[in-house]
Amino acid sequence: MIKSILTQIWNQRRANGWLFAELLIVFVLLWYCLDMLYGFAYAERQPKGYDLEHVYKLRLSTNPKQLVLCSSEDSLQSFWFKPMEEAFRRIKEYPGVESASIWLGSDTYTRDAVFQGYTIDSVGVKDANVRYVSPEYFKVMRIPIEEGTGMFSGNIDAFESTTGSSLAFGSAQWNPAVTPLPAVISLDLADSLFHTSRGVLGKEFFDYYSGSSLRYRVAAVCSHQKSDDYARYESFILMPLPSWFYRWQAVPFISIRVRPEADTNDFATRFSREMTS
């Protein structure tokens, strides 16, 4: 019976051409959908390179009526650096906060991205997501360090180990005033620059557009990084907060990690109310 049906279909193949075309289109579309769903499921299961559980992102607001003169060091200290440091200190000392960090640059789960090109020979350029961070950032986000783990294994205090406003959110090891600048690069960027992700500690590279005047030293290599659950792994570079952060009065983000037992359903509401009261 089946043979008879197949024979009849073959004999009427000219008249049923549209049917075969329709089946082919359905098959291709179904294959495409299944392939896409498999890709999403596979990407979701891959580590992101950071841990956002019990992590909150805070936005600082400024007083638009308060003019701060960039040319006046006293004005910057009184109305910008000191209030920001005080706000950061209060956030760190809030009950239930395990750690806190300040950062700027490429954000996760958003379209806010900052890119820059880097090179080792002025010929080939490798683009990377840029993130400027205080040294506590690696503890807050729990970023796995593949090489150079000793750099952030100690108890880093952003204020005790620094002097002056230019290093307010740095440390002795994470110093934005030294040359070459320390940088933590992802495995992908290490492989793009040096064609290997191992044994690159201490190696130097520089900004493709600024030339060798802006040099970086690999202080550590972190795990693969991606911007959201379903994104592909991308090249990332993390470095100390730059000098223009202080000159231009940039308003940073603050990320905090809350202890699991303190991260209740009303934590965000309670935190906002008590910190602004």
Give a label for each model feature.
Residues 12-42, 50:
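Short, strongly hydrophobic transmembrane alpha-helices
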Residues 91, 138, 271:
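Hydrophobic, well-ordered secondary-structure elements that form the walls
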Residues 12, 91-95, 197:
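Acidic-histidine catalytic/liganding microenvironments
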Residues 124-236:
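Hydrophobic secondary-structure segments that place a key small or acidic residue at a functional site
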Residues 19-22, 57-60, 100-104, 183-186, ...:
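Short beta-strand segments
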